[in-house]
Amino acid sequence: MDVKYKKSDKSLTVYVYGELDECSASVAKNILDKLLSENLKAKRVVFDLSGISFMDSTGIGLLIGRYKKLKELKIPSFITGANFSTEKVIELAGLYSIMPKI
């Protein structure tokens, strides 16, 4: 699992690579929380999941946790780039209802 990011004037795009599951969730959580805390002036955060090879319910929980933190700060969050299998997990969990797909 790896995380990279790109900042612009208005948004922070977070690129997540590899597997997002029980084994990688705690590492991903620490990386994402640090990254988000360093970029509190972003107007929006986009999670680019095009590099995800596998995601389970632990990955969904991780994204929901980041959504809640960002919602408290009034920063909208979005998802983009999910492959077919990741998209199915996201749809089944109803995640797009709180983190829209762009």
What are these regions (language model features)?
Residues M1-D2, I102:
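Absolute protein N-terminus
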Residues K4-N30:
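STAS-typified acidic loop motif
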Residues E22-M99:
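Amphipathic alpha-helical interaction surfaces in cytosolic regulatory modules
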